[in-house]
Amino acid sequence: MTADRWTQAVREQLGIGRLLPLGDARDGAWIAERAAEAVLAGAVRRAPGVRLGRLRIALADPEDAEESAVPAPPSALPFGPLRVTAEFAATASRPLPATAALLRETLATAAAQRLGLTVSDVDLRVTGLLDEDAAEQPAGEEPELPPQARAEDGDAGVVAAAARAVPGVLRLTGTLGRPVHLEEVPGEAALTHRHVRLEVAVAADHRSRDVARAVREAVGAALPDRPTVAVVVSAVG
């Protein structure tokens, strides 16, 4: 890899943020923090009289988190309920507690129904009041999907084909390196087995957790040795 390509890869990896757990430890799936935040912010844009500020998603209780049943990708958080923290400004057209309740419900619903995140807490902080004329949310930019990953061959090609055939998969991406990563990992009784990590962009009209689960099943069945599989959702678009 040239210096320019290495620099670009590092920037892309830093840009997607941490990897948030999708589902529970048995699911073996994560979503890029940036992708999850974009979906939640997009849901809030349709809420009347409120403008979202800084948004953050993190483990609600790191000490109570559970390690994944499969090898985790770099920068992946362990599994456990998440806390969404958000700042917002609102108009005075309704009481602030009512606006906060609407915003809390909007964020929690989008996290659960559109992504499949397990959110236990939504913490909000009011940062200011908006004039009625300024209350309209600025139009959000269309999510920029990572570039289509290059074609794979061999077993990686088999994995890629199985993943692309799953409904809801837009493309394979490579922000963490190669789109399909195969490796030998230690198993029980000092035996090794193969592990597959792959990265996908998911359609916005499909629940990310469900797509990731279907990808894991398809990839696991596509190879005769039935490797363990981890799926990273890098973008939702």
Predicted regions: what is each one?
Residues 47-89, 123, 127-131, 171-201, ...:
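Short edge beta-strands and adjacent turn/loop segments
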